[in-house]
Amino acid sequence: MKYTYQYKALPSTEQKLELNVWVRTCQYWYNRQLGDRFDWWERNRSPVNACPLITPLPDLRERPNYYSQKKYLPEIKKQPATVEWSGETLDFSRVPANTLQQVCKRADLAFERFLAGDSSGSRSGKPRFKSQSRYRSLIIEGAGLDLNSCSIGGRYLYVKVPKIGLVKVRSHRHLPDGAILKQ
């Protein structure tokens, strides 16, 4: 049987600063992917009732999807990206690759729901670009997560997060023996 537990992390000040950099980088990457998808959507769609009989066709390109956008991650991690409107420099190499891949999955899911709709066929609204106040979560998963079962009075656990170190986690519910961390 699979269980899902959520615990509150209590990072130190240095860890909070690093996690804020991660969230900002993931927010930029999400918005960039969404912008690429909207650009594709605007260039490749044509309303049937408004199209003239003779019109030049623009160069069509492949539809961006999870895999096509994920393959750009190694190139982006090589050099820092500069945000055009703020001049901010973001270093993608500071964020674990699997976290950025989860951002790709998040953007793909939002755009697919917009195009295809849910099981009843009703389409959701156009996905929004996320501001810093709207993008406040990220998923850290993979082989780098280790659970150190040293608890202080049964109240705290320590989770080893890649590129950050040990993060203190409040243990409000006991983990079963042999528990494996996935995310």
Label the model's feature ranges.
Residues 1-183:
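Nucleic-acid substrate recognition interfaces
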